[in-house]
Swiss-Prot record:
Annotated SUPFAM superfamilies: Multidrug resistance efflux transporter EmrE
Protein name as it appears in the record: Riboflavin transporter ImpX
Task performed by this protein: Transports riboflavin into the cell.
InterPro entries named in the record: AA-Vitamin_Transporters, EamA_dom
Transmembrane regions listed in the UniProt entry: 7-27, 34-54, 68-88, 101-121, 129-149, 158-178, 202-222, 224-244, 253-273, 276-296
Expression induction: Expression is probably regulated by riboflavin, via an FMN riboswitch.
Topology versus the membrane: Multi-pass membrane protein
Organism: Fusobacterium nucleatum subsp. nucleatum (strain ATCC 23726 / VPI 4351)
Location of the protein in the cell: Cell membrane
Family recorded in the similarity comment: Belongs to the EamA transporter family.
Amino acid sequence: MDNHIKGALLVCLAATMWGFDGIALTPRLFSLHVPFVVFILHLLPLILMSILFGKEEVKNIKKLQKNDLFFFFCVALFGGCLGTLCIVKALFLVNFKHLTVVTLLQKLQPIFAIILARLLLKEKLKRAYLFWGFLALLGGYLLTFEFHLPEFVSSDNLLPASLYSLLAAFSFGSATVFGKRILKSASFRTALYLRYLMTSCIMFVIVTFTSGFGDFLVATAGNWLIFVIIALTTGSGAILLYYFGLRYITAKVATMCELCFPISSVVFDYLINGNVLSPVQIASAILMIISIIKISKLN
């Protein structure tokens, strides 16, 4: 098989796995506390990676500068902790009714990344960014509320869930910006291991002072099975597939392949939960995704 085709298929597979996770896996952990869920979602992959290559990566981590470690901490704090806390909370709030909306709103992440890159990294902002950024935000609003005001559609926790999803997109976008500062400091494997290590440590502190660890006794066998499936597939497994695929394709091709995420989210939500987007929501999702693609090409 041609390497370009292989790379595209791997990115498509990773994006589809993330879509399946947001619809079918993580929402079914709703009986547990959110901080505990996020902690375990990072701890299990960390344990697996520690067994496979932990000793080698600890040596690589010791070689990093303090400045690099600070930015790694920021990536773990925003991308690993805050972003994941917000998106898991959003998925739990909607009670399987608006999962597609919550997952699709994450696609606004590049908007926040571009804004933060302008503010923090002083990167130039083209006028076209503003145009497509506005259309993306408009599409996100119509996807969530259609032609209504937020207060009129606040049933089913859609409004707070949407806000949590947007905050997650902002947090993931922040992690992307901070990640730009450390791309040349470590390999992807080292960066992935350190991110999960720091996130697990931060979440341990958060769980200690919030929900506690009582969920270890409350979690059912089904909960632990979902945790293991996520750890091996849609968690670190999907990330590895994604970046392995990126080695063989361009960023523009990857952007198109990532459309498997929203498409699979819609399909899985229909097949598993019986939820269907309205015509207005479908049109809004298309507008938002096209705008994000345009922004990615500009970038």
